[in-house]
């Protein structure tokens, strides 16, 4: 099949369950599908976490991997670009205050703030929370909207930054415009062909929203999925 189509995939919630390894049956199906295709992974996570979730057999077949909200791009072993970000001390103090004051009944383990290339990731319950704790917090947060309130306050206080919901428990924070749409813009600028994007956090507060909109506005296709199974069903049509 021609590589005039470029497929861009979010990872958590799209190719895998949040922070889990790719399911073996999904891996087999994806390996059959990926043959002859141009595929990019676009994640809020860093490369280390992506490699923990996605098998090498798939990573090695990808045309590129965009990490940390598009702030780092790898083509094979070649680093194409890497952005930097030094968060204001007042932002770190604000996040620490949010963590101390959380009303969440679920409390996991530190770190609460994780520094990544060109961004930081924040969670009130701790990144080393178990899968059970993550799910419990996610269900609680759907009703109480803690993360939405936090990201709204961040953007009001720091107008040059943007904050987006990431995964089940966290918020991705980066300079305005340095979101996942950096990946689709790079592909469009440097490669010819149509772009098709798949992601699960495609509402305005989600970390897939900007790339979802960018692809659709520029002649591509964007799909909002609810699970890896949902993604597989769509791939059967592509």
Where are each of the predicted segments found?
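Short, hydrophobic/glycine-enriched beta-strand segments
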Residues: 5-11, 41
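Glycine-rich beta-strand-to-loop/alpha-helix junction loops that act as flexible
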Residues: 11, 69, 198-201
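Short glycine-/acidic-enriched loop or helix-start segments at secondary-structure transitions
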Residues: 18-19, 50-53, 76-77, 132, ...
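Active-site phosphate-binding/coordination module
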Residues: 20-112
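Substrate-recognition element of Asp-dependent hydrolases with the DxDx(T/V) motif
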Residues: 31-53, 65, 112-124, 165-167, ...
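Conserved acidic, metal-coordinating active-site core of Asp-based
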Residues: 106-196, 204
């Amino acid at each position: 099949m021609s590589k005039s189509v470029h497929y861009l995939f979010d990872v958590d919630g799209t190719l895998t369950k949040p922070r889990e390894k790719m399911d073996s049956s999904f891996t087999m199906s994806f390996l059959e599908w990926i043959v002859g295709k141009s595929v990019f992974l676009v994640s809020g996570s860093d490369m280390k976490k992506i490699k923990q979730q996605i098998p090498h057999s798939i990573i090695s077949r990808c045309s590129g991997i965009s990490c940390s909200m598009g702030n780092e791009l790898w083509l094979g072993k070649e680093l194409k670009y890497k952005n930097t970000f030094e968060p204001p001390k007042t932002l770190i103090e604000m996040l620490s205050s949010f963590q101390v004051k959380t009303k969440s009944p679920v409390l996991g383990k530190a770190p609460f703030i994780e520094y990544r290339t060109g961004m930081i990731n924040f969670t009130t319950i701790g990144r080393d929370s178990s899968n059970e704790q993550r799910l419990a917090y996610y269900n609680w947060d759907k009703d109480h909207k803690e993360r939405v309130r936090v990201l709204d306050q961040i953007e009001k206080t720091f107008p040059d930054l943007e904050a987006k919901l990431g995964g089940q428990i966290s918020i991705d924070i980066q300079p305005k415009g340095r979101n996942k749409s950096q990946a689709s813009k790079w592909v469009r600028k440097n490669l010819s062909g149509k772009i098709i994007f798949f992601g699960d956090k495609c509402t305005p507060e989600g970390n897939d929203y900007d790339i979802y909109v960018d692809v659709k506005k520029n002649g591509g296709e964007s799909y909002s999925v609810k699970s890896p199974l949902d993604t597989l069903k769509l791939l059967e049509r592509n």
